[in-house]
């Protein structure tokens, strides 16, 4: 009796674990471009309307960076402003009023002063297609 109970438990547990297998999605072309060029992923935000503002915290644990790249996925978006706040509180506002197509990247954005800790990046942007939700990713190297 005990043996059949254990066997039933093992079969049930195996079936449950088999359902927990997670498949990862392959990187999109824009992400592949960033990774091929030595950039590391810093975070992402979703654009939730025609006008949106988001803060992407980065922090000392992520390292020091001398360049940034913006990757846009899923839908076109317009970035009105981007403000980089460094670890020492200094701010940098690269010229970024750009329209991004779906699955595209920005140019490499050189940061002033060499490799630096980034505290946060503020984005002000808007979707270009009603009802679409663009994903904006930040990459650094």
Task: Give the ranges of each region predicted by the language model.
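Exposed aromatic-hydrophobic patches
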Residues: 54-59, 105-112
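Local beta-strand/beta-hairpin segments that build beta-sheet-rich folds
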Residues: 34-45
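Bacterial Sec signal peptide processing site at the extreme N-terminus
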Residues: 16-36
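Bacterial N-terminal signal peptides that target proteins for export
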Residues: 1-13
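Short, surface-exposed beta-strand/strand-loop-strand elements in extracellular ectodomains
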Residues: 73-96, 132-141
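Solvent-exposed serine/threonine-rich low-complexity stretches and specific carbohydrate-binding patches
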Residues: 43-45, 94-101
